[in-house]
């Protein structure tokens, strides 16, 4: 006889209960552990590992017996084996619960599990339509975004399939333009712009494609060569209201109103704007004059004007008319900048940079030293080096400790340097006299005129102040003379060199020949030498000046030139083409002059 699963479980539970009751009766009540006491109080018996193993063995034996009985009865054992195996795993995991003997609880748990499974299935079924709904919502959002973008494009005036093309060769035709952009797509329209003056092609065209993709392909031809020109391709922007001009946003710069200055600047005027149009705009204001900005050379209008009003009330009314349309263009109206006079010496302003005089400003703070060179002051180098910027005014002089000048331009330092230079000049240079004109030259027995010229550094001192050779700057004072090796003068003003040249020139005086009367200058300057015994000094006589040259002594002395009289260094190095000797030119050769005489 085949037993059902419920009956098998009931039988097994009865056997377990009997075995438990027998084991409890056999155990000593005194040796009961704490766990057993707790189990008895909670009515939940707990089995040890050994008892669990024994129960498992008994369960296995009983199952084997049941199977044998089923086979003997001719029942199908395959189905029961699979069911028993599945159930056995559950029984092993829930052995403790089975021992409780609560059949009702397990029967209640099964329908709850089934309910939970049904709920899960319902949730899954409900999730799928939600996902579908979410997908539909996302698609709707995307469609809305695309619509918004297209609306924005239309509002901005961007036409996706129309392009602006510039830089087209002037001799190109519409067919040539179509053939050039044929690879991009189907061209619907080509609008070529012509010049209004002569009706010739201006090199600009608007091309409309069939699709937006064709326009995108054509944008790749930007900066491409077409003939001898390069193309400029941009997206076409459509103006929503072409009749009304677009107002330009102002840059934000607006000069402030100045009391008593009622001039207004008007910019962004059309080229055909006249004075009548401006007066019509300011009809509510009292206008004194209107000046249109024009090119001085061509007289063409430059697109701006200045209007002078009678009072500040008219200026305030005029400023409110900013961005009003005149001749199709919105004009800019603001206060004009006030012109500053040239005498306004305000440092730090760019408008007065040309009229700012540094000498007048800093003359009292940093006076020119008494012994400063006249050439430095006249050229403006003194003020350029001493008072160059605000940094110089903040600096302190290392020599005197005062502000306003550098140590290189310190008056005390310059005065000391000039005193030292003057003392050296008193020892090393010659007490000379200013150059004098001499037209009556003494004649020799051979009726020849002589030109006596003596070189002294004192002549150079009279050439507009201190010269570079006698009383130069700090560089001259620090240099050494190449002739004598001493400091304080250059080799061109060395006393020893000048003395030697006087001896060489004296030999030339004896070789000169009588010549015709010539206008020359004689500089008779006595030079001191190092020899204390030679108190008389030496004179240098030069007669190699050319006949047709007339020298203005006063101008030569003032300009510090004396090119014809004081050029011994070059003349001494040259050779005469007539006699082959050094020291004179062919024009002053004694042999040549003798032949001519």
From Swiss-Prot:
Gene Ontology biological process terms from the UniProt entry: cell plate formation involved in plant-type cell wall biogenesis; phragmoplast assembly
The protein's name in its UniProt record: Phragmoplastin interacting protein 1
Keywords (A to Z) from UniProt: Cell membrane, Cytoplasm, Cytoskeleton, Membrane, Metal-binding, Nucleus, Repeat, RNA-binding, Zinc, Zinc-finger
Task performed by this protein: RNA-binding protein which mediates polarized mRNA (e.g. Ran2 transcripts mRNA) transport from the nucleus to the vicinity of the cell plate during cytokinesis and phragmoplast formation.
CDD domains, alphabetized: RRM1_PHIP1, RRM2_PHIP1
Residues covered by region (Disordered): 18-136
Start and end residues, zinc fingers (CCHC-type): 397-411, 481-495, 576-591
Disulphide bond pairs: none
Biased composition (Polar residues): 20-29
Pfam family, one: RRM_1
Domain RRM: 161-238, 262-338
Superkingdom classification of source: Eukaryota
Molecular function terms from GO: mRNA binding; zinc ion binding
Assembly mode: Interacts with phragmoplastins (e.g. DRP1A, DRP1B, DRP1C, DRP1D and DRP1E) and with GTP-bound ARAC11/ROP1 as well as with Ran2 transcripts.
SMART domains: RRM (SM00360), ZnF_C2HC (SM00343)
Name of the encoding gene: PHIP1
Biased segments, Basic residues type: 43-53, 112-129
SUPFAM superfamilies: Retrovirus zinc finger-like domains, RNA-binding domain, RBD
Entry keyword annotation includes ATP-binding: no
Bias (Low complexity) ranges: 30-40
Membrane topology: Peripheral membrane protein
């Amino acid at each position: 006889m085949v037993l059902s699963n419920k009956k098998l479980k009931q039988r097994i539970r009865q056997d377990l209960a009997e075995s438990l009751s027998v084991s409890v009766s056999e155990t000593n009540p005194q040796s009961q552990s704490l766990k057993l006491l707790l189990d008895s109080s909670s009515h939940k018996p707990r089995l040890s590992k050994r008892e669990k193993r024994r129960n498992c063995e008994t369960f296995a034996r009983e199952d084997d017996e049941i199977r044998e009985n089923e086979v003997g009865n001719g029942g199908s054992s395959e189905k029961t084996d699979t069911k028993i195996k599945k159930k056995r795993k559950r029984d092993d995991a829930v052995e403790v619960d089975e021992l409780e003997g609560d059949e009702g609880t397990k029967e209640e748990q099964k329908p709850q599990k089934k309910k939970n499974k049904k709920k899960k299935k319902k949730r899954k079924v409900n999730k799928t339509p939600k996902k579908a709904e979410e997908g539909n919502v996302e698609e709707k959002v995307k469609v809305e975004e695309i619509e918004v973008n297209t609306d924005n494009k239309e509002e901005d005036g961007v036409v996706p399939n129309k392009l602006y093309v510039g830089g087209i060769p002037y001799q190109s035709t519409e067919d040539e333009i179509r053939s050039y952009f044929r690879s991009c797509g189907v061209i619907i329209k080509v609008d070529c712009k012509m010049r209004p003056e002569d009706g010739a092609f201006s090199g600009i065209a608007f091309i409309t494609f069939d699709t937006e993709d064709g326009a995108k392909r054509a944008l790749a031809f930007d900066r491409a060569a077409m003939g001898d020109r390069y193309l400029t391709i941009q997206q076409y922007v459509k103006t929503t209201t072409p009749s009304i001009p677009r107002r330009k946003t102002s840059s934000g710069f607006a000069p402030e109103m100045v009391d008593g200055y009622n001039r207004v600047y008007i910019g962004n005027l059309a080229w055909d704007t006249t004075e009548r149009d401006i007066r019509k705009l300011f009809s509510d204001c009292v206008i004194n004059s209107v000046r249109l900005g024009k090119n001085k050379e061509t007289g063409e209008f430059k697109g701006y004007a200045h209007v002078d009003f009678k009072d500040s009330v008219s200026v305030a009314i005029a400023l409110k008319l900013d961005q009003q349309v005149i001749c199709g263009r919105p004009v800019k109206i603001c206060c004009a900048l006030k012109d500053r006079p040239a005498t306004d010496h305000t440092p730090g302003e760019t408008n007065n940079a040309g009229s700012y005089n540094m000498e007048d400003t800093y003359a009292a703070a940093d006076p020119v030293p008494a012994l400063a060179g006249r050439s430095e002051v006249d050229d403006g180098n003194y003020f350029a080096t001493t008072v160059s910027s605000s940094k110089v005014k903040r600096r302190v002089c290392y020599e005197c400790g005062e502000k306003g000048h550098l140590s290189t331009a310190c008056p005390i330092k310059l005065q000391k340097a000039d005193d030292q230079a003057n003392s050296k000049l008193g020892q090393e240079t010659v007490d000379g006299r200013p150059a004098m004109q001499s037209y009556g030259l003494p004649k020799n027995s051979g009726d020849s005129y002589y030109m006596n010229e003596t070189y002294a550094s004192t002549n150079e001192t009279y050439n507009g102040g201190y010269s570079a050779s006698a009383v130069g700057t700090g560089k001259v004072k620090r240099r050494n003379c190449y002739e004598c090796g001493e400091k304080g003068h250059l080799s061109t003003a060395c006393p020893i060199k000048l003395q030697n040249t006087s001896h060489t020139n004296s030999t030339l005086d004896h070789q000169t020949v009588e010549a015709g009367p010539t206008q020359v200058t004689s500089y008779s300057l006595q030079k001191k030498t190092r020899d204390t015994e030679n108190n008389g000094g030496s004179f240098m006589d030069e007669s190699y000046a050319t006949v047709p040259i007339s020298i203005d002594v006063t101008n030569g002395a003032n300009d510090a030139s004396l090119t014809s009289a004081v050029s011994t260094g070059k003349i001494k190095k040259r050779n005469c083409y007539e006699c082959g000797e050094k020291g004179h030119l062919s024009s002053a050769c004694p042999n040549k002059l003798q032949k001519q005489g």
